[in-house]
Structure formats: structure tokens, C-alpha cells
Amino acid sequence: IYAADYGCVQRRRRTFIFAFKNTTKQYERMTSCFSADTKDGRVWLMQEGFFAHAFPVHSEVADPKKVTTVDFNEYTDTVDVTNRFRAAFYNSGVLCNGKIFSLEAVPNGKEPMLLGEIVVNGDIDKSFFIEDEDLEKWKYMKGAKTIERTSKTGYSYTFSEGPIAFPDPLDRPGRTMLTSEGTKNRSSHAITDPKTGKLRILLPEECERMNGFPTGWTDTG
């Protein structure tokens, strides 16, 4: 599930798994969707399922070719699965009584919020601004790099990482926020302050808004 597809201000993509016992009403509802007519989990994934209500999708799939149906009851053991299993999984799927059904669903959510919509446009304490002497360090952290490294055991390898936008664009949702936000590191957001035009990190209230909380949520006084 991609958070920006459902009106959030983060480009945050996460995999969610919802499981339940076969003695529950959820199980009864799910098995009823695997009827003789459909022979797959399309109704459950797109209309009746737990995620379909919380994160609705369109009735048409993204690509008719991106549909997978697998019956693990046709395999004798895990070795047989390893030797014969060939299938692709997509952004939605369900497993019911050994049968897997997966498809590429199209989110039917809301337009994402943009980072610029939650940014404070006013007087900001100078402690949030990036000092001139730190600018090159920030550029290095955000930039692409390839570094030859050697582990403690003597194993040599190449460490590489791609670039991150610096500063973060205000006309897009923000990147995934980590717990290290606000510190001097590669993952912290750095924006152009709307009022001064100078680079700064996010304010606590801006971080609250990015995570879906009201302003002042973390203010303990």
C-alpha cells in the first residue's frame, strides 16, 4: 500500500498482511467469495475484503495479464514447490485453503497531500536552518556515491547508493520519515524555507503533520 495513493503526505510504501483463523466470521466471508462462479479471490480483494473497505481499489485491474492463480494443493512437498513453482505476485493477493490469487489492483483513494501544504510559512527559529559550513556535508550525504569497503574479516565489497533530492521538493509528497528525522543524516528532509529561501530541516509540527497527527500532538509542555 502506497500512502500517497490515499491522501497522505508521505511516499511511503509498506506491505500489510492480515491473517485470521478458519473459525472466524472473516474466514466464512472469505471462503464465500471463492465461489464456483468466480473461482478466484477477485471479489474479496476488490470489494468484500478487509483491505478493500479500508483502502478501496477500482473494479478494473491495472493489467489483465498481471493476474496469478496458484493451488499449492497440487504440490507434493516443499521440494516440489522449489522445483516447479513459477509465478509472480502483485500488489494485492489472498491465500485461502492453499490457493493463492494475486492481481495488480488500481488504488481508488485521494490525491496525495504535497509537502508544501504542511510546511510552516512564518518566522522560524534559527536552530532549524542549515549552517553554511554544513552545506557541503549535507550535499555529500544526499549525493550518489560508490565506496570500496573492507569488512572486519577482510572481505572487500563496493558500497553504493543513489542520490536523494536536495532540497526536498515541496510540490511532491515527502519521502518516508524515519525516527532519525531532524538529525544531520542522509534520510532527514531538508527544504527551502518559503519565507527566507534558506535551507532548513523540518519543524516538529511539520513532522507531526507528515505522520497524520494534528499540530501540537507531541507537545508535552
Language-model features, listed with the residues they occupy:
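Polybasic, glycine- and aromatic-enriched phosphate-binding surface used to engage nucleic acids
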Residues: 132-212, 216-218
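Class I S-adenosyl-L-methionine
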Residues: 1-166
